[in-house]
Amino acid sequence: MTSIDLGLKRTLTDVLEDELYNMRLREQETAQEQLDLREAGKVRQVQLQQQQMFSQYADPSVTMMSGDVACEGVLSTAPANLLANPDIRQAPAPQAQAQMLQVNPEVLISYANKNSAHMNVSAVDDKLNRGLVDENSYYDDVDYSSMNAKMADWQLDDNVAMLDNNDARLIFDNEFADDDDLSDDENLFDEGLENYHNELVSSNSPIESLDVAEHKESVDDRLRKYHLDNIQNILSKTSTNDKDILQIKLPSDFTTTNLHSTNPSGLIEDPSQLVLGSSKKITEDTHVEEESKNLPDLTELTSATEIEDILLAVDSDDDDLYTKPIAKQTTKKDNSKPVEKTVVEKTSSVTKAGSNHSRSTLARPTAHARKLSSSRKQAPKVYNPKTTTKSTHTHSKNNATHEAFVCELVNSVTNEVCGAQFSRTYDLTRHQNTIHAKKRSIFRCSECIRALGDEGFQKTFSRLDALTRHIKAKHENLSLEERQQVTKYAKSNIGFVTA
């Protein structure tokens, strides 16, 4: 009996169950029609009986029986003409249970034997064109590819050829050959830097901070004052000793030459462009031999103080500065003569291509004068570290490069001065805090105790790093784990000794 006969209402669960079991069977109705027409009528009837069995409701005899029982019921109710057929009687028994478990018969079909003939492609395309089928339907990749016959006929070699297409790369490179991001960024950076430099000179320079009356002056006068201030700042920074160098005042007729023609930004790149009005201009035919005659001979100076004063005034690291007049006041103990001025000046003519000016540099001392000055300027260093003991150490200096710090504490064992020398104060302090401490910790080596007994127990180490060096040097045959055990024993059995 069916649900219609019983008059019962079907629930949503029943509807979903029917759809799940009968979905594939409905889709394969067209394929079933293409089967061999010589199929036995008994097998066809069994399939129809299985399809109709899931549409019945609340019939325990139908839902609980197995496939074999269902086959027996079908055979008993078959028409007489089918039973009389000798071919049907000799046919093998149908595998009803196996047919029920085969939900998707297309899984057993290989991809090579499957073609577009199993599916009505024209009907599916018609549904897609009319919008009756959703494009995002639950199609398998195999089913979706079988719809497009052209895609199924493609070979894998064609896809590899598309990936390795050199013509496409050449077309792309030719199309975007002029697209150079790095060059554009560099041009933008240069333009921005130039604009920033111009704004800095025009707005933030000290020229704009002058009074209103000074704004009426010419550009040359304002640049002259601006560079004059810069030169005075350089003099104040480059002087090594203000007491030895007199304050230099530039004359009022200080002028600039060809500033705007050589440098439009208004900044001086070469200090040799500054020319004093009262001094003679330096020409290209000036020679170093003629001007070096006026230099004082450093080897003839008998006093080392005079040599040192001259060397202090010379800035040997700055070769691009202009000529700096230097004056030093020297007095003698046995004579009260007026102050004598010693001027050291040296000019060197350097001719540049396309320029008519030369650069002047400062005089450099000889190697002998440098040695005398360096030996005089060095002063002995005295270092007195703070310690808790009264007598700590002495500082001995054998030569200019080696310094030794000697410990003068009394050794509690020998009752004599320790006399240990160290090259660093850190080592001396660590030595005094460990060896000469009133209460210090000691470490023992377990391997020495095991091998030597009491003698090994008397062997102690003031620091743990000393014990580590002892293990590496004396117990080389120990493994890494055994060395760690020795160190662990020393840490857990620390001894203390009072002086």
UniProtKB/Swiss-Prot annotation:
Instruction: Give the source species.
Output: Candida glabrata (strain ATCC 2001 / BCRC 20586 / JCM 3761 / NBRC 0622 / NRRL Y-65 / CBS 138) (Yeast)
UniProt keyword Cell membrane, yes or no: no
Where in or outside the cell it occurs: the entry states: Nucleus
Q: Which residue intervals are annotated with compositional bias (Polar residues) in the record?
A: 345-363
InterPro entries tied to this protein: Znf_C2H2_type
- The ranges of region (Disordered) come to 329-397
Induction (UniProt)? Expression is up-regulated in a fluconazole-resistant mutant.
> Which GO molecular function terms does the record list?
DNA binding; zinc ion binding
Which segments does the entry list as coiled coil? none
Zn finger (C2H2-type) ranges are 405-436
Alphabetical keyword list:
Activator, DNA-binding, Metal-binding, Nucleus, Transcription, Transcription regulation, Zinc, Zinc-finger
What does this chain do? Transcription factor that acts as a transcriptional activator of a number of genes encoding proteasomal subunits. Plays a role in ergosterol and plasma membrane homeostasis, and subsequent azole resistance. Regulates the expression of 212 genes, activating 80 genes and repressing, likely in an indirect fashion, 132 genes. Targets comprise several proteasome and ergosterol biosynthesis genes, including ERG1, ERG2, ERG3, and ERG11. Directly regulates ERG11 expression through the 3'-TTGCAAA-5' binding motif.
Task: Output this protein's name.
Answer: C2H2-type transcription factor RPN4
